[in-house]
């Protein structure tokens, strides 16, 4: 049986932080929904600095789709001013079973 990486291409992991009007606008809920639709795993949470941060893992193409969504779409009432992606790397296995909101 082929593992997920061989079946779907390289597995990637990336950390992100979204700046702008991203708290109090259901950004985390929409992020969790989009991640589940795309089939990526990881987490999302609000920060004390007024940003939203998290991590996404999955097949490279799906992680790239999630990065694009985080950069340009977000929740309907959000305003994304900037997003920083950090520690993007290839991984051998997923570290999460699903996508969740952290508090």
UniProtKB/Swiss-Prot annotation:
To which protein family does this belong?
A: Belongs to the acylphosphatase family.
Q: What is its EC number?
A: 3.6.1.7
Q: Which organism is it from?
A: Xenopus tropicalis (Western clawed frog)
One function term, GO molecular function aspect = acylphosphatase activity
Name under which the protein is recorded: Acylphosphatase-2
For this UniProt record, give its keywords in alphabetical order, as a comma-separated list. Hydrolase
Any keyword Isomerase? no
Kindly identify the residues recorded as the active site: 28, 46
The record, for InterPro entries, names:
Acylphosphatase, Acylphosphatase-like_dom, Acylphosphatase-like_dom_sf, Acylphosphatase_CS
Q: Does the keyword Hydrolase apply?
A: yes
EC top class named in words: hydrolase
Catalysed reactions, semicolon-separated: an acyl phosphate + H2O = a carboxylate + phosphate + H(+)
PANTHER family, from UniProt? ACYLPHOSPHATASE, ACYLPHOSPHATASE-2
- Taking every annotated instance into account, which residue ranges of this chain make up the domain Acylphosphatase-like? 13-103
């Amino acid at each position: 049986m082929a593992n997920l990486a061989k079946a779907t291409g390289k597995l990637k992991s990336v950390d992100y932080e979204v700046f702008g009007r991203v708290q109090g606008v259901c950004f985390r809920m929409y992020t969790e929904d989009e991640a589940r639709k795309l089939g990526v795993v990881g987490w999302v949470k609000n920060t004390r600095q007024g940003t939203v941060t998290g991590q996404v893992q999955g097949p490279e193409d799906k992680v790239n789709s999630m990065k694009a969504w985080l950069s340009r779409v977000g929740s309907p009432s959000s305003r994304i001013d900037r997003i920083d992606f950090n520690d993007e790397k290839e991984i051998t296995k997923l570290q999460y079973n699903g996508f969740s909101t952290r508090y």
